[in-house]
């Protein structure tokens, strides 16, 4: 029996501090200019390399229990057994317990190692658990495609690869959950095999999706073009807390781009110029002042989405009323987030929002990730 190699990599969620849509390109994509940041909230991506001949790359979505890392130990056992015995891994449960009380997850006031800030007992459910069963399978799954792309580019035969994802980052949220999972696969494999430079890894990532190059390294970055031209920016001051809320609605990203294109055609559209939002954010980041960063947060899709889902503006107003330095939509939604300079203020805001929003979570902004 071949020896198995078991790799685990964190896949951190992202937020848009700004998102400027500059116009449609000839290739059908839109030129973007935006500032993005990483948060501690993350999925765990586990890979098992090495299996008998005929065990091809496979994938299974799992649900991360917010209270424990036991899922990873189970994942390692199940994946090793699947590859060595050539059997199917048991199906993951469709739901997980709600966010649990402090007694189950450690001392209040300590950020857990999964990037979640412990909160008091609540009936709030985790949308990651509800959506894990809906993750694309086979070639439709970006993490599996990332593994295959890496092996193809490196000319490596891993002797089989099993990919399993423990979901925490909500799906269809504008937090690049799928792209982050793919980036985590590329990072984990490159740490193990060391086949590529950072630049080459970005090229492989861009072939998978526009957000993957950013998600490879994360941190605070200016992204331009489709999102592939990246410029590292100063980290936010210590103590940048985030409240995430995900209302119960869904939107079509192509439809939002279409509506935004029409809005921009109006004579009164964007009087400040197409890049003014991001320019203001760059000035705030260089100054290193968290209140200025909060005040500069902006997203071109927010006014478009507000026409279809008024709860977006309602959540932003409530976050600001609870002390957020700024509140904005990330990506094309549906997560709205507030920036706070204190965990106590963030938790008070989260408690207020939980009465009306099905998913509320507290986390922190994190620095860039190293690949080597």
Give residue spans per PLM region.
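Glycine/threonine-rich beta-strand-loop-alpha-helix active-site module
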Residues: 194-233
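Solvent-exposed alpha-helices and their adjacent loops that cap or buttress functional pockets
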Residues: 2, 37-38, 155, 206-207, ...
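DPxDG-like acidic metal-binding loop motif
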Residues: 143, 173-200, 214-216
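Conserved glycine-rich beta-strand-loop-beta hairpin in the small C-terminal domain of fold type I
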Residues: 334-335
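ATP-binding N-lobe of GHMP and related small-molecule kinases
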Residues: 1-173, 191-195, 236, 246-249
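Conserved, helical-rich catalytic subdomain that frames metal- and/or nucleotide-binding sites
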Residues: 217, 222-326, 341-344, 351, ...
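Phosphate-handling active-site elements
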Residues: 152-164, 188-208, 342-355
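Residue-level signal for inorganic ion chemistry
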Residues: 17, 45-47, 143, 178, ...
């Amino acid at each position: 029996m071949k020896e198995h190699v078991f790799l685990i990599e964190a896949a951190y969620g992202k937020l848009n501090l700004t998102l400027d849509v500059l116009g449609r390109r000839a290739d059908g994509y839109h030129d973007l200019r935006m500032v993005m940041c990483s948060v501690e909230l993350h999925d765990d991506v586990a890979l098992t390399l090495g299996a008998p001949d005929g065990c091809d790359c496979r994938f299974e979505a799992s649900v991360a229990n917010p209270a424990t890392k036991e899922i990873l130990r189970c994942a390692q056992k199940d994946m090793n057994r699947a590859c060595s015995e050539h059997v199917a891994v048991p199906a993951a449960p469709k739901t997980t317990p709600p966010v649990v009380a402090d007694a189950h997850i450690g001392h209040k006031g300590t950020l857990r190692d999964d990037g979640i800030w412990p909160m008091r007992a609540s009936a709030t459910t985790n949308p990651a658990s509800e959506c894990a069963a809906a993750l694309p399978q086979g070639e439709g799954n970006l993490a599996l495609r990332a593994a295959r792309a890496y092996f193809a580019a490196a000319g490596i035969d891993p002797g089989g690869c099993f990919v399993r994802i423990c979901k925490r980052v909500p799906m269809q949220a504008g937090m690049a959950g799928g792209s982050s999972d793919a980036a985590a696969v590329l990072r984990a494999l490159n740490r193990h095999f060391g086949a590529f430079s950072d630049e080459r890894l970005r090229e492989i990532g861009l072939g998978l999706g526009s957000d993957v190059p950013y998600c490879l390294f994360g941190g605070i970055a200016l992204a331009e073009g489709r999102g592939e031209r990246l410029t590292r920016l100063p980290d936010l001051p210590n103590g940048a807390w985030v409240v995430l809320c995900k209302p119960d609605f869904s939107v079509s990203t192509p439809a939002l781009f279409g509506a935004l294109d029409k809005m921009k055609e109006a004579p009164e559209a964007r009087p400040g110029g197409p890049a003014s939002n991001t320019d203001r954010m760059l000035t705030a980041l260089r100054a290193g002042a968290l209140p200025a960063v909060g005040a500069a947060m902006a997203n071109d899709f927010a006014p478009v989405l507000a026409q279809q889902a008024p709860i977006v503006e309602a959540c932003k107003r409530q976050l600001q009323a609870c002390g957020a330095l700024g509140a904005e939509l990330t990506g094309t939604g549906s997560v709205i987030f507030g920036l706070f300079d204190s965990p106590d203020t963030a938790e008070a805001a989260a408690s207020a929002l939980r009465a009306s929003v099905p998913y509320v979570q507290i986390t922190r902004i994190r620095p860039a990730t190293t690949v080597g």
